[in-house]
Amino acid sequence: MNKLFAMAAALAAFGFAATAVEAQEKTPDKVKIGLIVTLSGPPAVLGHQIRNGFELAVAHLGGKLGGLEADVLVQDDELKPDVAVNKVKAFVDRDQVSFIVGPVFSNILQAIMKPATENGTFLISPNAGTSSFAGKDCNANFFVTSYQNNQAHEVLGKYAQDSGVKKAFLMAPNYQAGKDALNGFKNYFKGDVVDEVYVPLNQLDYSAELSKIADAKPDAIFVFLPGGMGVNFVKQFRQAGLADKITFLSAFTVDESTLPAQQDAAIGFFGGQNWAPNLDNPQTKKFVADYEKAYGAVPGTYAFQAYDAGLLIDSAIRQVHGDLSDKDAVRAALKKADFTSLRGAFKFNTNHYPIQDFYLVKVAKRPDGKYETEIAKKIFENYADPYAKDCAMK
C-alpha cells in the first residue's frame, strides 16, 4: 500500500512539474515588436518621431514591455505599399512578432491591414486612422492610439465656423487621408468653399496653388500637408505675402515635425491636435523633457502617439502576465487600455479608436529659441468619431 501511495505521489509531482514546464513554455521571456514607418524621403521626419517616441517608451520601461524584454525590429516602408506589404509579411512569417506598430500614412495602412492582422498579430497604429477601418471595415486586431483621420481637421472646421469665416480655400494630398481631412473640415464648416484642391503626395512646389489662393481671396485657407510638403508650403505661403491677408488653418502641417525647418514662417499659424507639448500634466512634462534630452528636438503628436502605443502594449502584456498565446485575452487587455496616457483622459470606443479631447493649437517661439505648438483652446471634449456606429464590434 505504501508503495502505491509513493507511486501516486511521484506521479502527482511529475504532473505538477510538467504543468510548470508547460506554463514556462507558454510565457516567453521576450516580446517581438515590428515597427514599420516611413524613414526615407520628405516624410521621413514623421517616421523618425514615431520611432523615437516608441523607443523612449521602452527606455522608460527599462527596456521591457509588460515585464518581457522588448525586441523592437524597425523597417522603412519607403512610402510604397508593395514594399510595406513584403516587410509586414516578413515580420509575421519570419520574425513571428506579436505586435506590429505603424504606419505613418493611410495608403500604407490600407495595404498592410490584411497581412498584418489575419493570422492573429495585433496592429497598433500610432498615426494612420482611416474612416473605413473606424467603421464598416473595423478589425478586432487593430487598435489606434492617434485619432480617426477626420477628427483633427474637424477642429479647424468648427473653429472656422464659430469664428465667422465666410470663404475658405481647401487643399490636401490626393490619397485617402487627404480626402478624410477635407471631409472632416467640411463636417463643421458650412460657409463657402471657394476651391478644393488635391495635390500629388510629396509635391514640393506650390506656385500654381498659391496663385489660385491669391485669386480666390478667401478669408481662410485650410490645408493638410504633412512632412516636407508642409515645410515648403508654409515657407512659400509666407514668402508670397499671403500670411497677413488670409488666416492659416491646418492640421499636421505646422507641428513639431516641421517647425524646426519652418521656424518664423509658421509663427501664429493654427493647427488642430489631440495633444501639445505644453499640455499641463506631469507625464507630459517628463516626456517632453526626456525626449528633448535624448533627441535634441521638441516632440510632436507623432512621437507622443507612438509613446502611448508603447504604454498600451506594456499594459496589455502585464494584464495577461506575459502569456501572449491567448489572443482573446490579449485583445481584451488592449481594449481595456489600462495606462496613463500623455493626453490625460483616454479610452477606446467600440471600434478600437480613442475617445479623447481635441484642441486648437497655435505656433509659438519659446524663450530658448525652439518652436512648438501651444494650446489655444479646447474645441472637443471626450470626442468620438462618427464612424464607430458602422462598426460591428461592440
Task: Name every feature range the model reports, one short phrase each.
Residues L35, F91, D95-V104, I124-P126, ...:
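Periplasmic-binding protein-like
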